[in-house]
Amino acid sequence: MRYIIFVFVQIALGYALCRYVGRRVPGDQLLRKVLKWSVIAIPILSIGLILTTSLLKGRAPELVTDLLIAEIYFAALFALLDSATKSHYGRVTALLCLSLILPVMIAGRRNVREPITTRYRIVLPDKKPSDSVRIALVTDIHLGELFGEEHLARMEQMIEQASPDYVFIGGDLIDRNLSDVDTLTAAYHFAHLREKVQGLCFVLGNHEYYGDLDENVQWISSLGTLLRDSVVRLRPDLYLIGRDYYSAWDKDLIPLSSLAEQVPDGSTSILLQHRPREHWERDPDVSGIDLTLTGHTHAGQIFPMQIFQPLLFSHNYGCHPSGDGTLIISSGYGASTSRLRIGSRSEIVVIDLYFKGT
């Protein structure tokens, strides 16, 4: 399907280019004929180049996606600046803007390849326990065709440097199929992490449902504690509520209130779920949830998605008040479809949770 979309976009862009330039070429000149043939030649040559240079490395789908993104950016800028090219100033401006596409694509790769550590300090003055807690939140790892051992090794190193008490994996650990994952190597990295923390907990994301759900669930359960609409006590008076992924899937939604009721009064409750709450969601906010941790949005991943995500979610990234508590949305550690981020950055999140008297 990705290659079909690629061919379609190539032909559409080639046709638009031919019509645009053709109107400006007087008479029946050779250039106009060449442009007509380029509608067919451009996609064929592009696909041939990609397949011959990268198929053996297994990176053809990713490069196709990146090329499409670059071309869409190019076409959008070309269309927006077309009216300005009638003057010398407009032509210079257009060339400068178009020249930024390659640096932006390079920076977009760097935004995924060099993740950062984002830190938050949350104070709960009226809650137990008395000892502070450090949590590492990692969402949207997307193990599979795009990300593998190097991706996990870097994540493990970043988490170890943060020295958390608990590690929470907030869904989309697997991009789609477990067959695309080096499960032995991945299990080694998570086992190494599990030895150094007090708890390693997981919830499912939408991508776990895209593949063989039973197989994905069985493997993730072997790595640590998988929570599917369940509650686990981390410490005395500190509880983690883990929510299953439910959006767009035909299943009965367990009310969050029924899960929150399992947390004793006066105890601290942390909610871990993959997706932040959407505007029209029928499950209301529940008072008493002290900290909600989510991912899924990728903080838009590629501009201009950051503009449209607020139509779905109240927030798409960062730390925000939520009911009686705090909501933290991570941009995610990996990326979806392409190892490219424009206007967002891959990250792990470290939360220092303080209580009364600490």
Q: Can you say where each PLM-predicted feature lies in the sequence?
A:
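Short N-terminal secondary-structure initiator segments
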Residues: M1-R2, R109-Y120, L178-A187, D214
